[in-house]
Amino acid sequence: MRTVRDLEVEERRVLVRVDYNVPLEGGRVVDDTRIRATLPTLQWLLERRARIILCSHLGRPKGQVREELRLAPVAATLSGLLGQPVRSVRDIVGPEAQEMARRLQPGEVGMLENLRFDPREEQNDAEFAAALAALADCYVNDAFGAAHRAHASVVAVARLLPSAAGFLMEREVQALERVLRSDERPFVLVLGGAKVSDKIGVIENLLPRADALLLGGGMANTFLRARGLETGRSLVEEEKVPEAQRILDLAAARGVRVELPRDVVVAPTMSAVSQRRIVPVTAIPPDQAVYDIGPETVRAYSAVIAGARLLVWNGPMGVYEVPEFREGTKGIAEAVAGCSGFTLVGGGDSAAALQELGLAERVGHLSTGGGATLEYLEGRELPGVAVLMEEA
């Protein structure tokens, strides 16, 4: 894959696609992780006095201008992190954007408006891509989180300019390739989250090489049901129970150790946190639902994690948005951070737990991609990565 090191960038206009799809509250950025992740690329370009034109999407405006999804607050946050002005325009490819691109001096940074305000972005529209390309001399994609989208700023524009990956994109692909290609053993797969359907592809692609599969979150209930256990009022994908059984059979045939929760935290409802209690999985009351894994499960999983040479963790062990149901996820986060092997953690709640505990620096790679990371682990080709591997 071509990287930014392969481009002539000195004093040139560089269109940089970033993934600044960050949470905003009251017009302020509340989590700048994705912005910080692009700083190595931007600082490298600024050292070479490039004229940087940033473009990103934010939220799902569906081709309409929505005031609360403008990128000005993101530009302000980036400005503080870079220690220099970031000029944001309220335009994507129109006169204001063209004027900003023309006036940019070497070592300056500008930011286009939210790409998804224009419906042509998500259509991978050739005309829109040409208008973006006309603003710059070359293109850098540092938006791994959007690499699974065949959109104009991800795919079409990369074919119109000398193009390459930024350092974040490079790091993401290298980490994921290591997981997919490495023969380091034991290889442990830790999967959580609500739905089996979201993780089936990952399990099917990685199970043939895994030594252990540890399951938590709502998806574990579907596997417990496949093992013939009662799960009370818990979230279960009934139509996926046969699929879960097939995976359990496949794992058994391949000698893969599958660990399901041994004890769980139950409550009558998600909001009835004061009534929560820990029960063995064999004794889930019919009027209660599972909202987290229990301490015995955390200990058992932690012992398996400690011996891993290669580990992938994606998805929380419980309902992470409710503080009382975070303990299982936190316990797994501590175990993963303590693992001496190479650890790759998919974003979302898994990453949030590591950051909350101050352990983010202790994992091998903390991915910024949500859907993109899952699709890569499924063995699928990502359009935004594939285009950077095409012959120039």
Swiss-Prot record:
Q: Where's it mainly located?
A: cytoplasm
What is its pathway?
Carbohydrate degradation; glycolysis; pyruvate from D-glyceraldehyde 3-phosphate: step 2/5
**Keyword Kinase among record annotations:** yes
One biological process term in Gene Ontology: gluconeogenesis
Q: Where in the cell is it found?
A: Cytoplasm
Q: What is its EC number?
A: 2.7.2.3
Q: PROSITE patterns this protein is in? A: PGLYCERATE_KINASE
Top enzyme category: transferase
Please give the subunit comment from the record.
Monomer.
Under what name is this protein listed?
Answer: Phosphoglycerate kinase
